[in-house]
Amino acid sequence: KRCYRTPDLKSQTCPPGEDLCYTKKWCADWCTSRGKVIELGCVATCPTVKPYEEITCCSTDNCNPHPKMPKP
């Protein structure tokens, strides 16, 4: 499995057993000026969403590009 990972936004091979890619977004102190913090990576199971987070999981290679990345 290959997923985009932060902080370098490069597609990387996931560790064994981590077969899902995820995108997690949340607001930090600077949310109004810079927008939401975005974290990308690999997980074994989709994380539980906390009230202030948005989490999307997907199961195909590189299915979690950063929202501002150009589409291939």
From Swiss-Prot:
CDD domains: TFP_snake_toxin. Gene3D superfamilies: CD59 (2.10.60.10). One of its GO terms (cellular component) is extracellular region. The keyword Secreted applies. PROSITE patterns: SNAKE_TOXIN (PS00272). Keywords: Acetylcholine receptor inhibiting toxin, Disulfide bond, Ion channel impairing toxin, Neurotoxin, Postsynaptic neurotoxin, Secreted, Toxin. GO terms for molecular function: acetylcholine receptor inhibitor activity; ion channel regulator activity; toxin activity. Expressed by the venom gland. It is found in: Secreted. It comes from the Eukaryota. InterPro entries: Snake_3FTx (IPR003571), Snake_toxin-like_sf (IPR045860), Snake_toxin_con_site (IPR018354), Toxin_cobra-type (IPR054131). SUPFAM superfamilies: Snake toxin-like (SSF57302). Its main location: secreted. Disulfide bonds join C3-C21, C14-C42, C27-C31, C46-C57, C58-C63. Belongs to the three-finger toxin family. Long-chain subfamily. Type II alpha-neurotoxin sub-subfamily. Binds with high affinity to muscular (alpha-1-beta-1-gamma-delta/CHRNA1-CHRNB1-CHRNG-CHRND) and neuronal (alpha-7/CHRNA7) nicotinic acetylcholine receptor (nAChR) and inhibits acetylcholine from binding to the receptor, thereby impairing neuromuscular and neuronal transmission. Ranges of nAChR inhibition are in nanomolar (competitive binding with alpha-bungarotoxin gives Ki=8.66 nM on muscle nAChR and Ki=9.47 nM on alpha-7). This is Long neurotoxin Tx-NM2.
